[in-house]
Amino acid sequence: MANVQNLAFGRDVQGYNAFAPQPSNVKYKATITNGTAASVTVPSTYQVWIVSFRYFPNDVWVDVSGATATIPLSGALVASTAELNPASLELTAGTNISMVTSQTAADVSVVMWPVSYP
């Protein structure tokens, strides 16, 4: 894998971390279709990663448990390993990220930053 940009935040005028991270060079994108899951695996080059998700339209189920993401059935609330439209997650190397939508199609973007602890 090419050199990756570690998770690092810009500084504000007082020297504190700003909200936005530096750009990443570990990015994935796809257009997923109704009921067909797509997946990507977190790289193994670092142990911990911050993973950011973007979707259009917002109707994407994401599963990071190792299972394939599924669309929920109508009816009562049930336990699930999938999450609807997570913004970002801290994941470990080798985690499988599975995504599925009930829309005709959904554009997804997955951006990752490795974390180095001192």
Predicted regions and their residues:
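Short proline/glycine-enriched turn/loop motifs at strand-loop junctions of beta-rich domains
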Residues: 46-48, 54-59, 103-105
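Short, surface-exposed beta-strand/strand-loop-strand elements in extracellular ectodomains
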Residues: 54-73
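Beta-sandwich interaction modules
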Residues: 78-94
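Surface-exposed ligand/attachment interfaces on beta-rich extracellular proteins
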Residues: 22-46, 104
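Noncatalytic modules at the cell exterior or secretory-pathway interfaces
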Residues: 49, 89-108
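Short, intrinsically disordered N-terminal pre-domain segments
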Residues: 1-24, 114-118
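Gly/Pro-rich, tryptophan- and cysteine-flecked surface segments typical
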Residues: 2, 28-34, 109-111
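Edge beta-strands of jelly-roll/beta-sandwich modules across compartments, strongly enriched
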Residues: 62, 104-116
